[in-house]
Structure formats: structure tokens, C-alpha cells
Regions:
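Extended catalytic cores of very large enzyme megasubunits
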Residues: 2-256
Length: 256
């Protein structure tokens, strides 16, 4: 996958918190792609090839399964039977997501959260090269310099105000979304290149920055309070916003 997986999965000690049943351990031992004669080579984003590391895949799936009524081993098994020599890391991510999504049913609804977490992991890796998002100020500076965010964000707010707003953000709320919700965010709202599929942000930045734009002209003494209240309502879906607002506000098109 990537060198950052250990750092990423350690963000909240996810793996250590996950309990593994004896049956799941047995299933894992039966997966024998690590046998030298069965070695699969993966193609990384930089074009380099290296042997597949099943332990990294195992850790990511078990991390995403935390506190969910799902079988991580079933998702692993369903993923690995689709791996082939030369598969890219992006295809591995997508295969894992599909393996989880294919198990969603009325009898096993928690797979919608597992698939969503794996998709969020994938989107963040595409956007940032790692699981952990950058600070709000770093994100805005980079996106403004690339012409993807409205440059007035940097003139309307000071670096200290961005630091304060950064404290409002709870990126872990991404992990509470359903698969359908994340797919909608990916398809309609995230700033991205729709030609090559590059993604440049993750969901919590949308909710915070829409509020920051909407209240940017309010009195400085009170506007951050409005931004925080807006963010908390929008990011927990207590507030529904039209597509032009969600997709356009914070970008040079503005749409408000």
C-alpha cells in the first residue's frame, strides 16, 4: 500500500483496539499469497514494483472494521482472490472497497460503514498522500496557490483565525458516514479533477470552509462562532445544503 500505513492506522490506535476471533485467525492462516511461489508484485504510484505486503492490507481492513459487526477476514479473502501480478496500489484500494460494499445487506448493514471508511482512506491517500489531513491553513494556502480555492479566504481570515477554525474540525466524523454518503460526497461535492480523478480535499474541509465563506463578512467578534455552529450542524447532517453551495462555495466559482 504505502509507507504511511503504520502511521495512519496508529492515529487512534485502531488496530490495537480491534478484537480478532479465533475463526478469523484461522482464516488468515489459510490465505497463502505470501508463499514465495505465489508472490504478487504491486505497482506503486511512482511506477516502482515491489512484493505485495498482505500484512499492511490486513491492518487497514481490521482498522476500518473497528466496533463494526462485520467479518474483516471475509473482506480480505474476497479482495485477495481478485489480486493479480502488477496490480496498482489504487486498484488494491478500490478492490477492498468493492469487496466490502458487495457485502452490504439488510442482514449485515455495518458493511456500509466499513466500505465508507475504506473509501475515506482511499480518498485521503489520493488527496494528501497519507491518511492524516493537513492543517486547515496549509490546505487553504496550497489550494489557493493551485487556483482551486477562492483567494479571498486568505485575505478575509488571518492565520490565527484559521488555527482557531482548525480546532473546530473533527476529521473522525468522516468515519461515521455511510458508503452511500461518501459516494455522494465524492461524486458531487469534493474539489477534484473530473478528467483524471485526482481528489484535492476530504469532507470535513467542505463543511468548515463553506461556513467560513458564508460568514466571512460578518463582524470579526462573532463570525467564528457562526462558523463553528454551522460546521457542527452541516458535518452531522442536521443541516442540508443545495449542491451549488456544497460544491461551489470555497472555490473561485463561489456559487453564492
Amino acid at each position: 500500500m504505502g509507507e504511511e500505513v503504520e502511521e495512519e492506522t496508529g492515529l487512534r490506535s485502531e488496530v490495537e483496539k480491534t478484537s480478532v476471533s479465533k475463526e478469523e485467525v484461522v482464516e488468515q492462516e489459510e490465505i497463502n499469497l505470501e508463499d514465495p511461489k505465489n508472490t504478487i508484485f504491486i505497482t506503486k504510484r511512482n511506477g516502482k514494483q515491489e512484493p505485495i505486503d498482505l500484512e499492511k492490507i490486513h491492518r487497514v481492513i481490521f482498522w476500518a472494521s473497528e466496533n463494526l459487526d462485520v467479518s474483516p477476514s471475509q473482506v480480505e479473502l474476497n479482495s485477495q482472490i481478485q489480486f493479480y501480478d502488477g496490480i496498482t496500489t489504487e486498484e488494491i484500494h478500490e478492490t477492498m472497497i468493492k469487496a466490502a460494499a458487495d457485502l452490504i445487506s439488510t442482514e449485515s448493514p455495518d458493511y456500509q460503514y466499513l466500505a465508507a471508511r475504506l473509501l475515506i482512506f482511499h480518498l485521503r491517500k489520493k488527496a494528501y498522500g497519507q491518511f492524516k489531513p493537513p492543517s486547515l491553513y496549509e490546505q487553504v494556502k496550497k489550494m489557493v496557490s493551485e487556483g482551486r480555492y477562492d483567494p479571498e479566504l486568505l485575505t478575509d481570515y488571518t492565520e490565527d483565525e484559521f488555527s482557531t477554525m482548525d480546532g473546530f474540525i473533527d476529521h473522525w466524523r468522516d468515519m461515521k458516514f455511510t458508503y452511500a454518503a461518501v459516494k455522494q460526497l465524492e461524486g458531487k461535492y469534493l474539489v477534484q479533477n473530473r478528467v483524471n480523478g485526482d481528489v484535492y480535499e476530504s469532507p470535513q474541509f467542505i463543511f468548515l470552509l463553506v461556513g467560513a465563506c458564508l460568514f466571512s463578512k460578518y463582524p470579526k467578534e462573532t463570525r467564528l462562532d457562526y462558523v463553528e455552529r454551522f460546521y457542527n450542524a452541516a458535518s452531522t447532517f442536521k443541516l442540508s445544503l443545495p449542491t451549488p453551495i456544497m460544491s461551489g462555495v470555497r472555490t473561485p466559482t463561489r456559487q453564492f
